[in-house]
């Protein structure tokens, strides 16, 4: 499988060069209120996606109003000063557009996909739902029940639960440690005043990016932005996009064992401090993650895999159900590590943790081959191309990059960064990030045999 992947994308630079010659790249402009417009024109298409990215998510909340950004997302389509809920739905259907939104720890995003001639209408609607929502009390109460049910569903998703707890202990008493939905007590108590205060504080022009991709004319989108978003106020003390807005997050050593002995599996997340979106070693972190890789028993690969960890997992079929290496980045911090699902017995849990630590130590010791490094780089480039499939995916990439780093690297620029990575870079990165550094860990399920953080640190540092 890996050789086929490497072969398939051996000529990615030639392919990317062809694509780049046809696409003019990302253009940016800025309104007087600080709002950034960023676009990428895609030839030979008649549709486009436009999205408004706000540099504010659950990270912009406090303990008392945690969950407000997500609550606002639910209310965005429930009526504005200019349109009723039915009116919004009818208008979207009449132009055949698709409207959606999501909230993350750092961003609030609303986007619409439409035909080229309907871009002005799409921008108008995005502005309306973002800046002029009515926030009707009856709608608030209805959505409160919906969000409570959503929270209950999330609690059944073990990976979500584990990673929420991982953030909470790793960023203890810090904004990044808060969940996106917020605690149930907040969901039950958030008021219209809380919602309006969040908008007033965070919805500022200099904290917004209007991104467009597809059959979109940059100059025209700038005009639409001025018409529909020009009224958005500017921050009293604007901070450039990609610059810190507060104290840098502190990575905290810690562990949490959530005992659920009735579960047939144990879920474990082990993390060390990773890298931010704009860190110089961002792509090295991803390449190191790719070398560690992922494995799933259900897929049945591994015995012929070039990954020693995958081979160990597959040769002992009960060692783990699956594992997934991760490199999660934020504007000024990150988490790098492994998520494991295994049967709840002492033998399996101890073995899989030891095998993972063995793999990390192998990378630190330099016992990786040039072939592994080249394979990891090929996988990164392949993943990039596959992730930019369609105007919506490109808008997501543009918006995320500009909001978090202040600029957008083109795919070709990313390829250049990845191609520069050497085996020595990865070894140096692993020795800096994985040696004598604090570890955080969360385990869910039958946790009685899960090694603690002290054990992991001791083994990793040997």
UniProtKB/Swiss-Prot annotation:
Q: How is its activity regulated?
A: Binding to MAS2 is required for catalytic activity. Inhibited by high levels (> 1uM) of zinc. Inhibited by metal chelators ethylenediaminetetraacetic acid (EDTA) and O-phenanthroline.
Q: Which GO terms describe its biological process?
A: protein processing involved in protein targeting to mitochondrion
Range annotated as the organelle transit peptide: 1-20
Highest taxon of source: Eukaryota
Positions carrying Phosphoserine are: 243
In its keyword annotation, does this UniProt entry include Hydrolase?
Answer: yes
Outcome recorded upon mutating residue 89 to A:
Loss of catalytic activity and loss of binding to MAS2
Return the InterPro entries for the record. Metalloenz_LuxS/M16 (IPR011249), MPP/UQCRC_Complex (IPR050361), Pept_M16_N (IPR011765), Pept_M16_Zn_BS (IPR001431), Peptidase_M16_C (IPR007863)
Q: Which UniProt keywords apply?
A: Hydrolase, Metal-binding, Metalloprotease, Mitochondrion, Phosphoprotein, Protease, Transit peptide, Zinc
* Cofactor comment: Binds 1 zinc ion per subunit.
Q: What changes when the gene is disrupted? A: Simultaneous disruption of the mitochondrial presequence protease CYM1 results in synthetic lethality in respiratory conditions.
Q: Which reaction does it catalyse?
A: Release of N-terminal transit peptides from precursor proteins imported into the mitochondrion, typically with Arg in position P2
Enzyme class per UniProt: hydrolase
* Task of the protein: Catalytic subunit of the essential mitochondrial processing protease (MPP), which cleaves the mitochondrial sequence off newly imported precursors proteins. Preferentially, cleaves after an arginine at position P2.
Protein family per UniProt: Belongs to the peptidase M16 family.
**Miscellaneous field:** Present with 1360 molecules/cell in log phase SD medium.
Protein name from the UniProt record: Mitochondrial-processing peptidase subunit beta
């Amino acid at each position: 499988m890996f050789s086929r992947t490497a072969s398939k994308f051996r000529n990615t630079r030639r392919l990317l060069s062809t694509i780049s010659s046809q696409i003019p790249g990302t253009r940016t402009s800025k309104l007087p209120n600080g709002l950034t417009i960023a676009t990428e024109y895609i030839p030979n298409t008649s549709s486009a996606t436009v999205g408004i990215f706000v540099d504010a998510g659950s990270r912009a909340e406090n303990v008392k109003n945690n969950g407000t950004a997500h609550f606002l997302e639910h209310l965005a389509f429930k009526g504005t000063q200019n349109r009723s809920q039915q009116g919004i739905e009818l208008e979207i259907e009449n132009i055949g557009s698709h409207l959606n939104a999501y909230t993350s720890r750092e961003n609030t995003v609303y986007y619409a996909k439409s035909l080229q001639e309907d871009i002005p209408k799409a921008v108008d609607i995005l502005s309306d739902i973002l800046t002029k929502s009515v926030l009707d009390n009856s709608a608030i109460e209805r959505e409160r029940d919906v969000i409570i049910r959503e929270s209950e569903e999330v609690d059944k998703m073990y990976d979500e639960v584990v990673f929420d707890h991982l953030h909470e202990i790793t960023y203890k008493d810090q904004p990044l440690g808060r969940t996106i939905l917020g605690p149930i007590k907040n969901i039950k108590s958030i008021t219209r005043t809380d919602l309006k205060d969040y908008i007033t504080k965070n919805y500022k022009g200099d904290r917004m990016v209007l991104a467009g991709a597809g059959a979109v004319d940059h100059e025209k989108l700038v005009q639409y932005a001025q018409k529909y978003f020009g009224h958005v106020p500017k921050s009293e003390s604007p901070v450039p996009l990609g610059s810190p807005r507060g104290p840098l997050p502190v990575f905290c050593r810690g562990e949490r064992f959530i005992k659920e002995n009735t579960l047939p599996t144990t879920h474990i997340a082990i993390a060390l401090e990773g890298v931010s979106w704009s860190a110089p070693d961002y792509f090295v972190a991803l390449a190191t993650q790719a070398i560690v890789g992922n494995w799933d028993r259900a897929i049945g690969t591994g015995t012929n895999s070039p990954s020693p960890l995958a081979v160990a997992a597959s040769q002992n079929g009960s060692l783990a159900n699956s594992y997934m290496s991760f490199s999660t980045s934020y504007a000024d911090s990150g988490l790098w590590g492994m998520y494991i699902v295994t049967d709840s017995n002492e033998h399996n849990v101890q073995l899989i943790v030891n095998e993972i630590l063995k793999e990390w130590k192998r990378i630190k010791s330099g016992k990786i081959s040039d072939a592994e490094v080249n394979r990891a780089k090929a996988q990164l480039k392949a993943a990039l191309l596959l992730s930019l499939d369609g105007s919506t995916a490109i808008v997501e990439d543009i918006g995320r990059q500009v909001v978090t780093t202040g600029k957008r690297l083109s795919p070709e620029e990313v390829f250049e960064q990845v191609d520069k990575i050497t085996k020595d870079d990865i070894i140096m990165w692993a020795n800096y990030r994985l040696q004598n550094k604090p570890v955080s860990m969360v385990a869910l399920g039958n946790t009685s045999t899960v090694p603690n953080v002290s054990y992991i640190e001791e083994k990793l540092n040997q």
